[in-house]
Amino acid sequence: MTRLDNSRVIRPATGPEISAKSWLTEAPMRMLMNNLHPDVAEAPHELVVYGGIGRAARDWESYDRIVETLRRLEGDETLLIQSGKPVGVFRTHADAPRVLLANSNLVPQWANWEHFHELDKKGLMMYGQMTAGSWIYIGSQGIVQGTYETFVEMGRQHYGGDLSGRWLLTAGLGGMGGAQPLAAVMAGASCLAIECQPSRIEMRLRTGYLDRQAASIDEALAMIEASHAEDKPVSVGLLGNAAEILPEIVRRGIRPDLLTDQTSAHDPVNGYLPAGWSLDQWFAKRESDPSAVAKAAKASMAVHVRAMLDLHAAGVPTTDYGNNIRQMAKDEGVENAFDFPGFVPAYVRPLFCRGIGPFRWVALSGDPEDIYRTDARVKQLLPDNTHLHNWLDMARERIQFQGLPARICWVGLGDRHRLGLAFNEMVASGELKAPIVIGRDHLDSGSVASPNRETEAMRDGSDAVSDWPLLNALLNTASGATWVSLHHGGGVGMGYSQHSGMVIVADGTPEAAKRLERVLWNDPGTGVMRHADAGYDIAIDCAREKGLDLPSI
């Protein structure tokens, strides 16, 4: 089993010529490769895409077999992927998914990091995160709008809708956390982001997600103060350990205006540098003594969260951004770790109630103009959504594409299928140079059960019920998505979440149009259903408005 190969540099093909037998198998192959593009993945030579050890394939042998199989797959066959390894090809039918993926799933009694690591070392499992193992990661853009929407809502709730002259304190500049600095600036706030790995700061600077780098707290704060004097928000990366810097900020009486965290705290071995440790020490100990790493990391997380609680008690609006750091701290004896809320119940759930979530699409042509044309079509189809228009304008101006050109755009039930059909028509007419791939994050309204994140504090107490993502995956399979995934442990770590994903190809054919209409209606419809079933009036009203058939509502 080979996981590290520094000789491998993966980039997807672009343009209209394909090496598979159809676009329905060319698309997952290109998206798998795009996940490992050096401008996209965090550690592509190790097959790691983002989120600690979130991988696209189990090992390089599995990667090669997946590509080989996709190239020969027939139009009525389905490839099965078990934790990043291709295990079977079966005859299905033309409207069935071409790929079905199950990643990181464990029977509940064994659903913990210790058992996962045992299997991982034996080559029997892979951590798929959310969009890493499901081949629809698009770089930090994939979470930018959701983060932006969260920060805007924080501004509405706490500062009258105006974040000018305000600053956000956070940590973590990995594949997900790397979106925070740009999202904050787009929302009108400055951002101080702590990151322990120089390579991550350098990547965010290179890709335009971060403006400046500072060597000390004082230098970072001076940069932010200067930006406020010029009425121009700035994002600053500070090299250091959050478990050391946050307590220092508390001791010095410094008060940010907003506070959150996106370190990879969900994975105490691979995702969080213990306080006082060097990177070299951390990397070595992860291999030689992972239990010691986990113990030290969790102790540091407790210190980190205590500092967040101190700032929260001092009146700083504070939110957990979904990395399970509160749970880790509580396990270490911080009994009031959940005194500050998660971002979904505090700021995002009303959107989920209407099936609104992280809809995304990718231009398989590799031509940015294809994305700009789809941006224009979105504005044309949704003429009254000025907030969305503003987002698209900012995205074009501020967001650099990583790998294949892509766009993230939060839309919901009733709009997703219209956009998908429009994109399909654009492919059919030749307005776009190649097909479009349409997908989403697993963080969506009906596709995840995660009691410390997306389903925290559900009205009816159904936080841990994971029937919903299973139903979502089954329905997307029956509806004809091109590939469907079912994962465990994404975002918050082993034992704390189950979630599903779907991707569908708009190749310009009438058959694709039928699949697009079904999938892109049904998928967000499950989100409205899930929240209506939990008793949310917004969701119940949306279900009635859209004519959903919900027998128990």
Swiss-Prot record:
Pathway: Amino-acid degradation; L-histidine degradation into L-glutamate; N-formimidoyl-L-glutamate from L-histidine: step 2/3. Its EC number is 4.2.1.49. The keyword Cytoplasm applies. The keyword Lyase applies. It is found in: Cytoplasm. GO terms for cellular component: cytoplasm. Binds 1 NAD(+) per subunit. It comes from the Bacteria. Keywords: Cytoplasm, Histidine metabolism, Lyase, NAD. Its cofactor is NAD(+). The active site is at C409. It catalyses: 4-imidazolone-5-propanoate = trans-urocanate + H2O. Signal peptide: none annotated. NAD(+) binds at residues 51-52, 129, 175-177, 195, 200, 241-242, 262-266, 272-273, 321, 491. One of its GO terms (molecular function) is urocanate hydratase activity. SUPFAM superfamilies: Urocanase. Belongs to the urocanase family. PANTHER family: UROCANATE HYDRATASE. Catalyzes the conversion of urocanate to 4-imidazolone-5-propionate. NCBIfam families: hutU, PRK05414.1. This is Urocanate hydratase. It comes from Sphingopyxis alaskensis (strain DSM 13593 / LMG 18877 / RB2256).
